[in-house]
């Protein structure tokens, strides 16, 4: 059974390996990219593990009173098991009552519905946000005023 924990610098090679496996077309981040980002202040990285093997990762960063959810990646064979939802909940808990912003692919309606369940509302379409001219939908959750859904 998988578990989620806060990532350490030692996890970054496994995170970069997953990134390369999942984002073959869209220009994956390198290990150096992850190391640089991880070292910045106000970063929050999580990993999902199954029997010691890292199977997914998520990240966020805080700037003033806003938290940006930046990454949420799970190996294909572990999807649809609630890992992404748990990543979201942990990052919302870390965000506290700050405003939370995220971007997701326009065609990823399943995840958009999950975000809506947790209080996110669409705010704008970001053309050419992802490689290969793929648009993103920006979604925002204003300052936390209610508890998270079960």
Question: Could you say what each language-model-derived stretch is?
Answer:
Residues 60, 64-66, 99, 134-136:
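A generic structural signal for beta-strand entry/edge sites
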Residues 35-36, 108, 131-132:
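Short secondary-structure capping/turn micro-motifs that flank functional sites
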Residues 74, 80-93, 109, 113-117:
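Conserved acetyl-CoA-binding loop-helix of GNAT-fold acetyltransferases
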Residues 94-106:
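Conserved GNAT acetyl-CoA-binding A-motif
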Residues 52, 56, 82-84, 119:
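Conserved phosphate-binding and hydrolysis motifs of nucleotide-dependent enzymes
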Residues 2, 6, 10-77, 88-90, ...:
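Acetyl-CoA-dependent GNAT
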Residues 148-150:
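Intrinsically disordered, low-complexity acidic/proline-/asparagine-rich linker or regulatory tail/stalk regions
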Residues 101-104, 116, 121-138:
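Conserved catalytic-core motifs of GNAT/GCN5-like acyltransferases
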């Amino acid at each position: 059974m998988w578990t989620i924990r806060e990532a350490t610098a030692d996890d970054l090679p496994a995170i970069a390996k997953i990134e390369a496996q999942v984002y073959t077309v869209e220009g994956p981040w390198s290990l150096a990219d992850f190391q640089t980002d991880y070292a910045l202040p106000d970063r929050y990285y999580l990993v999902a593990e199954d029997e010691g093997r890292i199977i997914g990762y998520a990240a966020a960063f805080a700037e003033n009173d806003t938290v940006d959810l930046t990454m949420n990646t799970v190996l294909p064979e572990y999807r649809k098991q609630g890992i992404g939802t748990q990543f979201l909940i942990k990052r919302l808990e870390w965000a506290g009552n700050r405003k939370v912003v995220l971007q997701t692919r326009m065609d990823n309606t399943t995840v958009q519905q999950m975000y809506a369940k947790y209080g996110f509302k669409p705010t704008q379409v970001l053309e050419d946000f992802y490689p290969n001219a793929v648009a993103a939908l920006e979604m925002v959750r204003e300052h936390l005023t209610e508890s998270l859904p079960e």
